[in-house]
Amino acid sequence: MQPLVEALAGEYQQRHPNFALDITAGGSLVGIQAVQEGQVDIGMASRALKAGEQEAGMQLFTIAYDALVIITHPSNPIKAVSLEELQAIYSGEITNWSALGGLDLAIEVVARELSSGTRGAFDEIVLGNATLKPEATVVATAGEVETNISKHAGAIGYVGFGNLPPTVTVVAIDGVSPTPESILNDSYRLKRPLSLLVGPLSRTQAHDFIAFANSQAGQSLISQGGWVAIKPAQ
């Protein structure tokens, strides 16, 4: 979410020159905990609050939608899988692309680290009660996912819709490709909210920044940046 919030902060600071916003990325878990402890005014989260995180005074505001986009090496002929097949790949039940009608090539699974909101959303939507295969390559950033995919013909990974690199193949899920339209109408099933979080110790201007993010100007910036705005353009 960092590039999204940086774009919003740049425009907000032009309108409010005395406003200073320091942005640090560390995953949704870090952001949520920092707001809970009063270390920051605003947290970034790309997943819903868990039961233990829903403390009194914590408020989550969705400002955009994103999709988890499944990507593979450009040489991979498989262009679509089902959600069930994707779960089987990441749990280790399916280990070779030939099982899906592809090349006789071992599948190399790439996942994000546990503190990542992207990982949390993927585990919830795709893995469910299954567990990630122990042999998976776990990386910290979307850029590292792309690097691994580009170097390994059998690799599969996931990135956010707003972080989609041009050098990979996008894999459709249940026959539906990720587009702004399919994300908004829920036909693309790997969807997640991008939200800002405030707590009882957050200062007033934190709420004003969130109001800007959900304004027409803020939503326009979100669309221009490649994410899916929650409010259609007027």
Place the predicted regions along the sequence by residue.
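Exported/periplasmic ABC-transporter solute-binding proteins
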Residues: 1-234
